[in-house]
Amino acid sequence: YWPSMPDPENFDAIDGKPSEEFMADWLVRTCELIDNYHPKILYFDWWIQQEAAKPYLKKAAAYYYNRAAEWGEEVAIDYKFDAYMFGTAVPDIERGQMADIKPYFWQTDTAIALNSWCYTENNDFRPAGDIICDLVDIVSKNGALLLNVGPKADGTISDEDTAVLTAIGDWMQVNGEAIYDTHVWRTFGEGPTKVQDGGFSDGVKKNFTGEDFRFTAKGDTLFAIALKANDNGEYHVHSLRMQEHTAGTVYHGLVESVSVLGTDDAPAWTRDESGLHIKTCLLYTSPSPRDGATS
């Protein structure tokens, strides 16, 4: 044992303790939102980690989860700063990701614009390819992406936001099978490009290469998602190499077939001691990221 140390994320000393009247009003308003709108997600940004809020958080969670059970719905509460006891809600990382796979479900929340959560002048919009790569990386590590879109004052969505969302939707139309209802594999991926761990890092450019892959799985299918297309259509997945189990490789099974999502053409493939080698008919010359999934 050792002397206790102050939590660096404890804001009680600078924020002041809320009154019981305030917290009771907060709880009633939260329950009113739950009853009136049946939300799928209850998202709390910050401040609720206050010590005075803890008993009210328990009541809010109990009310929400019980009401969801009555509705027959699966719901989630998102939180930061250890506001909820681990395992009772979903931990959230603002504008950042995990560097490695996690045994528990987690979430990233970020916005299409790097410099604002709202629609403002001179928004720095992120390319759709960057957001798609983040989505794939997050899912491969047992996470989910909550993407914010800031509407204009009249409630409409800007052309720039619409273009990004449409591009993401087009990609999901082809590759959604590798995202929806999948689970993590033995490792999240491979490749030379590292992802920074923790929040407020989505502004750090990730220069993915054709050697960067992320893995997801569903049933007896493994999805290997390339985070950047190779112009020659060739891909080499080293995690699927043929080696004895004593060599430390992550996969010792058979590869029965290989296919590419979005096309009926069967790619040529071989497998040896260095990896699974795939030759596709899909060639891309554009420098922008074009993400494909192979299973």
Per-region residue spans from a language model:
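Mature catalytic domains of secreted/periplasmic carbohydrate-active enzymes
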Residues: Y1-S286, S295
